[in-house]
């Protein structure tokens, strides 16, 4: 099963940490965010990974070559970050027609990916409540677990 990891952003909110290091290669403890996500998807049965890169993409590429030689990882380069939709269009030749998981490289999570229905033709969106320090967002999760948008 395929997974696309979105790793092309500038990481502006993490400056100055991301001036020389791409956000996916920032460490939490002894492990980068990207490593944590790659290991998580591999351990959940994803055997083909597509990663888009842009800002400091050469550093991500070098990291992957050093650490994931034995895994099927395809890099899709962007001259500048295209955003989520642009990244998917740019990578369309690698995505195919099968079900695919799309995640952000800079997300720290422990979501049980086995809960996703891999045979469905619909989209699953995994969301979490906005934290108290950042209450603005595009959508929220109500007490019933349903997604809603504030007007």
Model-identified regions with their sequence ranges:
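Hydrophobic residues embedded in beta-strands of well-ordered beta-sheets
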Residues: 145-147
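N-terminal glycine-rich phosphate-binding loop and ensuing alpha1 helix
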Residues: 1-60
């Amino acid at each position: 099963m395929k997974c696309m990891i979105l790793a092309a952003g500038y990481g502006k909110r993490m400056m100055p940490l991301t001036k020389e290091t791409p956000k996916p290669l920032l460490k939490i403890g002894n492990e980068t965010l990207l490593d944590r996500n790659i290991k998580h998807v591999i351990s959940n049965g994803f055997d083909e990974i597509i990663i888009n890169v842009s800002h400091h993409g050469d550093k991500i590429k070098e990291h992957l070559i050093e650490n994931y030689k034995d895994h099927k990882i395809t890099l899709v380069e962007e001259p500048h970050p295209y955003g989520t939709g642009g990244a998917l269009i740019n990578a369309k030749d690698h995505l195919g027609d099968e079900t695919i998981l799309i995640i952000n490289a800079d997300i720290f999570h422990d979501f049980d990916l086995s809960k996703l229905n891999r045979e469905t033709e619909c989209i699953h969106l995994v969301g979490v409540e906005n934290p108290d320090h950042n209450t603005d967002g595009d959508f929220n999760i109500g007490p019933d677990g349903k997604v809603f948008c504030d007007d």
